[in-house]
Amino acid sequence: DRFGVKPLYYYPTAGGVLFASEPKAIFANPEANPVLDASGIAELFALTTAPTPGHGLYKGLRQVRPGQALRFDRNGVRELVYWALRAERHEEGAEDSAERAGQLLREAVAEQLVADVPLGSLLSGGLDSSAISAFAVAALDGDARRLPTFSVDFPGEGRGFVPTPWQSSWDEPYAQLAANFLGTPHRTVLVAPEEVLEQDEAVLQARDLPGWGELDASLYL
């Protein structure tokens, strides 16, 4: 896709190419070997959260880059660019810019609601998740009952919370305020520290590579 939101991996072989949305699906084929080379190790330790576009971490594994398509034939693989983000001079004023940004966000959220699985929205207590949930409720004709929301918290977090430069306030009260305002059926999922540790292996298997530690584990739970 244009922005690489939904990944597509590929692995050239002697007789063709394997492709899937997850590395584990490719490595289920005996023709693919999950081997880390020097380049993959560098990606793993230096660029885990912002990997090089197209790099699949494992040797021989590649990822289709945002805005690109691939063509396979007997001569190998060719990357075709079908879309690229262009930087242009911004002429609109603040009011028009805000209206346009709101329109684009509403359209983007509405498109994501087209799904063959139950809908849901994670409320973190921040601006992003609150705004997305509000746009989603509006796209569902204002029927907040159709958008269950949930937040993740830890036992005793409110009593023992200490502000940091990365997190100045406790998330849960703000998530609850957003849910009350929108009228969504809300659930707070309490995750004990031992549950986070117990899920490390499952989280790694789900991601196919190391990630954000306890953050990934809490989202998985």
Task: Describe the predicted segments one by one.
Residues 1-206:
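Cysteine-centered catalytic environments shared across enzyme families
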Residues 55-56, 218-221:
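Short alpha-helical segments and helix-capping/turn motifs at coil-helix boundaries
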